Amino acid sequence: MTMSRNGKTNKAAYSQRFTRCSVAVAATRSASVVAAAFDFYICIIISTLLSLIVSLASQLLF
């Protein structure tokens, strides 16, 4: 009886640990996706600003 009960307890503890780990991994993945999207957005803004500056400079020089 105690062996069966202990086995159930261990299984429940493992299940809880696995669930917590899965939530942590999912949160990390979503955070990294958000960070990658933010980096991409910043890169687009910077490249747009640089092309605008080059365009304005070329109009002023020529």
UniProtKB/Swiss-Prot annotation:
The keyword Nucleus applies. The chain crosses the membrane at residues 33-53. One of its GO terms (cellular component) is cytoplasm. GO terms for biological process: cellular detoxification; detoxification of cadmium ion; detoxification of copper ion. Disulfide bonds: none annotated. Keywords: Cell membrane, Cell wall, Membrane, Metal-binding, Nucleus, Secreted, Stress response, Transmembrane, Transmembrane helix. Heterodimers. Binds weakly to CYSTM7 and WIH1/CYSTM13. Belongs to the CYSTM1 family. This is Protein CYSTEINE-RICH TRANSMEMBRANE MODULE 2. It comes from Arabidopsis thaliana (Mouse-ear cress).
